[in-house]
Amino acid sequence: MAWLEGQSVFLTGGVAGLGRALVKRLVEEGANVTVLDRNARGLDELVESFKGRVAGSPGDVRNLADNRKAVELAVERFGKLDTFNRQRRHLGLLCPPCRPAGRCHQRSFDEVIGINLMGYVMGIKAAAPALVRSRGSVILTLSSSAFYAGGGGVLYTVAKHAAVGLIKQAAHELAPYVRVNGVAPGGIASDLRGPKSLGMGEQSITSVPLADLVKDIAPIGRLSDTEEYTGSYVYLASARNSAPATGVIINCDGGMGVRSVLGPASGGKGLLEKFGG
């Protein structure tokens, strides 16, 4: 039996990248999905691709009314809401350091914090009543910048660290009716863009040789595919399999937290030759 059979999921940012992969996985696991995304054309294509299983609601994740409209659509179309998944992430890797002499200003603060933090808050606020009724769950997408420095600019790293606190506080405030958890993926080769306020709206993370960089620094020795991250979301969305989990963040960083600071990134090189296989 599929893990999410008959469930209704509200997901933001599902048109491309990890969000698109997650929509596919959720449908495969038996869920119906309502997607909020600013890309109206991409949203129409997504809905057409999953006939009858996906509903689209164009809008801005920072706007409470847009989030409420998507929640209403999910309940109207699929009868209930079981999980809110805040998926869209603003690009941090290309953001310049926010030093006193750098390009950090109020507009970039509002943009990066707004998308990466207020979007979480607005989504939770809109979805909470329906989730309380269904005894559902919230799953927020973080990144390795929620735990480590150096993976993004100051604003992005601050936003992701703040989201850790948001998960813990929301888990407390919504208990015992709603579980609140997070998934922190490592590097992803998707078309995430930089802040428009810094003139980086057309810069994509695809311009960075991410696969080569991660290969050398991550203990697992490679860049993970978007599909490989989706299982963590399915696990947390399944009350049958993760009922005791709330205030939890699954850190899928490819082992960055255990890499050596003096030796090679991974300590198991040579084991294949030693043990065979």
UniProtKB/Swiss-Prot annotation:
pH sensitivity of activity: Optimum pH is 9.
Activity relative to temperature: Optimum temperature is 40 degrees Celsius.
Binding site for NAD(+): 10-37, 60, 160
E.C. number: 1.3.1.49
Source organism, top-level taxon: Bacteria
PROSITE patterns with a match to the protein in the record: ADH_SHORT (PS00061)
Residues the record marks as active site: 156 (proton acceptor)
Binding site for substrate: 143
SUPFAM superfamilies recorded: NAD(P)-binding Rossmann-fold domains
InterPro entries in the cross-refs: NAD(P)-bd_dom_sf (IPR036291), Sc_DH/Rdtase_CS (IPR020904), SDR_fam (IPR002347)
Pfam families: adh_short
Keywords, alphabetical: Aromatic hydrocarbons catabolism, NAD, NADP, Oxidoreductase
Catalytic activity reported: (3S,4R)-3,4-dihydrophenanthrene-3,4-diol + NAD(+) = phenanthrene-3,4-diol + NADH + H(+)
Regulation of protein activity: Inhibited by heavy metal such as Hg(2+) and by p-chloromercuribenzoate.
Molecular function, one GO term: cis-3,4-dihydrophenanthrene-3,4-diol dehydrogenase activity
GO biological process annotation, one example: phenanthrene catabolic process
Function (record text): Involved in the degradation of phenanthrene. Catalyzes the oxidation of cis-phenanthrene dihydrodiol (PDD) to yield phenanthrenediol. It can use either NAD or NADP as electron acceptor, however NAD is preferred to NADP.
Family label: Belongs to the short-chain dehydrogenases/reductases (SDR) family.
Oligomeric form and interacting partners: Homotetramer.
Name recorded for this polypeptide: Cis-3,4-dihydrophenanthrene-3,4-diol dehydrogenase
Organism in which the protein naturally occurs: Alcaligenes faecalis
Gene this protein is translated from: phnB
